[in-house]
Amino acid sequence: MPKRTDIKSILILGAGPIVIGQACEFDYSGAQACKALREEGYRVILVNSNPATIMTDPEMADATYIEPIHWEVVRKIIEKERPDAVLPTMGGQTALNCALELERQGVLEEFGVTMIGATADAIDKAEDRRRFDVAMKKIGLETARSGIAHTMEEALAVAADVGFPCIIRPSFTMGGSGGGIAYNREEFEEICARGLDLSPTKELLIDESLIGWKEYEMEVVRDKNDNCIIVCSIENFDAMGIHTGDSITVAPAQTLTDKEYQIMRNASMAVLREIGVETGGSNVQFAVNPKNGRLIVIEMNPRVSRSSALASKATGFPIAKVAAKLAVGYTLDELMNDITGGRTPASFEPSIDYVVTKIPRFNFEKFAGANDRLTTQMKSVGEVMAIGRTQQESLQKALRGLEVGATGFDPKVSLDDPEALTKIRRELKDAGAERIWYIADAFRAGLSVDGVFNLTNIDRWFLVQIEELVRLEEKVAEVGITGLNAEFLRQLKRKGFADARLAKLAGVREAEIRKLRDQYDLHPVYKRVDTCAAEFATDTAYMYSTYEEECEANPSTDREKIMVLGGGPNRIGQGIEFDYCCVHASLALREDGYETIMVNCNPETVSTDYDTSDRLYFEPVTLEDVLEIVRIEKPKGVIVQYGGQTPLKLARALEAAGVPVIGTSPDAIDRAEDRERFQHAVDRLKLKQPANATVTAIEMAVEKAKEIGYPLVVRPSYVLGGRAMEIVYDEADLRRYFQTAVSVSNDAPVLLDHFLDDAVEVDVDAICDGEMVLIGGIMEHIEQAGVHSGDSACSLPAYTLSQEIQDVMRQQVQKLAFELQVRGLMNVQFAVKNNEVYLIEVNPRAARTVPFVSKATGVPLAKVAARVMAGKSLAEQGVTKEVIPPYYSVKEVVLPFNKFPGVDPLLGPEMRSTGEVMGVGRTFAEAFAKAQLGSNSTMKKHGRALLSVREGDKERVVDLAAKLLKQGFELDATHGTAIVLGEAGINPRLVNKVHEGRPHIQDRIKNGEYTYIINTTSGRRAIEDSRVIRRSALQYKVHYDTTLNGGFATAMALNADATEKVISVQEMHAQIK
């Protein structure tokens, strides 16, 4: 039956900021849903607080609200826009929870809005653990023995019944938040306390342990006529006990017999029928006991998920797009499959003739003190996917695409080490982020397949594959480059070995292996992802490489081509913002008539959607893989400045190989990154920088530090996201830094800068075309200098800086752009102290603020700059004036500390945020208040505030205290702060620090006495002492600031109402015109 005509407009709920467990896969699904529904003539209204998404671009929906995804705000949007229906299945757990809340609060009924895609009852039945268990029993499927608890007493009673170890999962949370595995009562109580706190319904499910069972997922799509298709089966390489988001996964499932697969297929369809999903996609997770084949249903998600993004990219079947059309009444047989050009209907189950491997990417090095063992709580921040003709090829391609310094199965331990075996065994038994490499080491150290299986419970079939690769590596090392004849080299390439790995094994340079392949004329061919295992011809150019006979790439020869290199897997410091830029480059150049080619390996993103570019190569972004694509495509230009450090690292090597890198030249990029070369440019332009030095040894650093003066910012050269960057306060601190952190330098020097305490930091994004410079936006940071710019909230326009100071910065940016010969985007960071402007750094590439600035000003910077790189001047594009909006936009960051108990949430020069939100208001205060609501802050309007500040903040704290009093807060202060306040006539209640006796600060936080805490520190001892305050504030959900500037912004926002007025991006941009 065709689409519904009783609904004319549809509200899509987005997923909000990127957090661990909910990443850019929902931008991909939301963007697809917007396109699909507008194609059908519906009016689409979108709400999503994350500005770094493609779906919040003004052309994606008819009305776009970058507002907090909070039921009261969404109610305002519904009241204003009057949609007929709401689609909550595209925005992850955030959207589902918001939709259920709108239903509970009677908002949907009040405005006559229907829920489409999933009914409130189906969502509740799938998410409510007790109802789900009952539903499964009804259709004869087993679930794990379990019980439900709402209090600690109930939880302990369930544990007595289920036994240890047991698995704890809170209801209605995402990415296993608050859950875990408890092996004893102490761990059990700790996990339950955290879980009860995080579950919006205060409900825990406590399961028998299925640790060591095999885990599978089925991606199912069902329509209202009960047509059901399995899009993809996915098998977890890691056994149960590790969250599926943290597991290596393989599609299609490799170790099921046909009979087992059919049983699981039928079971997953039965689950969708029973839960009542009849208009869209779901994923159903199963566990199988390898000893006896017992099958258990773990859970199902009645929405588009991380796995469905993976399944879409793995098969080419656009689940989100199809689900959106089913939600408005179509059936599967009425929809055509785009990839085959409509030669097959969407009711054909995809079949694939290749293997797909996904490996998660972790960032534990950013979180000192975090528990880096993998459990049922998700901890990975990104993922990489690779496609190959065999399991071995796809696994090795994924390993090199992960960008963790491995080009394949590089050894982790030296076999000469007497502790080697002990270490390998420990890593296999208790999995961390690197277990896959330790498995290869185990085979090198002489463990058998059974031996590894007993430690890991990973299916022997997978282990045999890895063992064979290790044996081949040993053979290469034995015969050397002279033994690599054409036949042997071909065999190795078919198994996915990278040139770089073979070079290391043979003891030669990578270029020599490449030369050898050229001699043998040994190059990959490209196959197409077509959903039908090559049964039907396909017009869609979605390719992967493999070493076989027939090439299906079929590149055009009549059009000018531009290739965009993507950013690879998400990680902290390089996330969705860079993908956003890549997508914009591709869209703009397509509009201008170029054929665009995208190279990337991140399955979550819009850039790897088959219709974002003319041609998509789903390949690792490494030198070898990129050069092979360039060899057959012969592009006119390659863009490396948009994908973060991943493609930038390749710029020089690509240029050396004769690849036309367009935009700012690799040499100019190097001039900005290399300290000494940059220093020459700065001196020539007579710009001010904080006193600094470059050192190569510890004693030299100690000498230079005396000249520059403490505190210092220390860091290795060439980093993104502030890796190994710290503020040190004295010589002892400096020596400690050199002993613990300088190993990251790879013979590169370490940079010392005088730290400008209390300076205001400013980010400026600009575009230069060689003739003029366009200022995109000037953003004033809210946290003072010293907090990494990626972790600081910022305001556009600036909210305290004078016009004169801003003009000085504009002039300096212009001088720098011409001096460095920038063609395209650049980002400059300044610090302002005592009305002096200091230059901090220049990045001649896309910065993570580009999407935010584009949304705030209505100027699509990434598109404009891409056209500049392709040779179209700013004047020709008609974009020559800086836009200063008549409203304020505030970007606030979202930090993942709740996933890492034990890590100090103090902000510093090392970036740790995973995502961002944006708030827009007529005043700075209103915009800041909205950004706080959007980032799930727990800011309250009144209550009791605790003030504990460092020496340098004591005079300014008086003003803040007065503002809080005026707002109706009662005040507490620690000893030193209380004295200063007392002298100013403010008398707070005195509280003890932790070492001063009880009741102390921590007791009072635990008792729920505070609604707001401000705690600023400097010096290592003070930071250690006050760490317990920050951890407790986080744990007990008290809004806290670790900078005084943050405190002042909070005080301003207390007067504003974040839920009072909503404004769409289209209305914002209309005010600028």
From Swiss-Prot:
Binding site for Mg(2+) 4: 841, 843
Chain positions recorded as Mn(2+) 1 binding sites: 285, 299
Binding site for ATP 2: 715, 754, 756, 761, 786-789, 829, 841
Keyword annotations of the record: Amino-acid biosynthesis, Arginine biosynthesis, ATP-binding, Ligase, Magnesium, Manganese, Metal-binding, Nucleotide-binding, Pyrimidine biosynthesis, Repeat
Residue segments, region Oligomerization domain: 404-553
Binding site for Mn(2+) 2: 299, 301
Residue ranges, annotated region (Carbamoyl phosphate synthetic domain): 554-936
Binding locations of Mn(2+) 4: 841, 843
A Pfam family: CPSase_L_D3
GO cellular component terms, A-Z: cytoplasm
ATP-grasp domain ranges (all copies): 133-328, 679-870
SUPFAM superfamilies (UniProt xref): Carbamoyl phosphate synthetase, large subunit connection domain, Glutathione synthetase ATP-binding domain-like, Methylglyoxal synthase-like, PreATP-grasp domain
Residues that, per the record, bind Mg(2+) 1: 285, 299
GO MF terms held by the record: ATP binding; carbamoyl-phosphate synthase (ammonia) activity; carbamoyl-phosphate synthase (glutamine-hydrolyzing) activity; metal ion binding
Allosteric domain: annotated span: 937-1073
Binding annotation for Mg(2+) 2: 299, 301
Positions of Mn(2+) 3 binding: 829, 841
Similarity field: Belongs to the CarB family.
Protein name per Swiss-Prot or TrEMBL: Carbamoyl phosphate synthase large chain
Origin species: Escherichia coli O157:H7
Highest classification ranks of the organism: Bacteria, Pseudomonadati, Pseudomonadota, Gammaproteobacteria, Enterobacterales
Gene this protein is translated from: carB
